[in-house]
């Protein structure tokens, strides 16, 4: 069964998570520089079967688009142009960064380790993907 990939796209960094082949468990894959995201994905898609890509949709508490929406929309357009046959689903990414930070605290990471923003982005993508899998059941 092909995998599902989640992208937490940001201005500087992009967190990426992937499911196992049974689409049961979400795991962090990596964090990359955002400007390299299309090249990274192109390479990844040649190595792994992916049936769908989830892309975080930043929203404010009231459901309105956040200030980073324009950046994400430009990425989505670029993604669609490069991978026209790939299924995309937009998912609400509110609170994922806070949940990622709390996960780091709960897992016992020291303060210096918790300041690793790349790790926060990867965990955020993983939380987004696991939430999607839970709702899919």
Curated annotation (Swiss-Prot):
**The UniProt record lists the keyword Nuclease:** yes
The signal peptide annotation in the UniProt record is: none
Keyword list, A-Z: Cytoplasm, Hydrolase, Nuclease, Ribosome biogenesis
- What SMART domains does the database record attribute to this sequence? YqgFc
**E.C. number:** 3.1.-.-
One Pfam family this chain carries?
RuvX
Q: What is this protein called?
A: Putative pre-16S rRNA nuclease
- What organism is the protein native to? Flavobacterium psychrophilum (strain ATCC 49511 / DSM 21280 / CIP 103535 / JIP02/86)
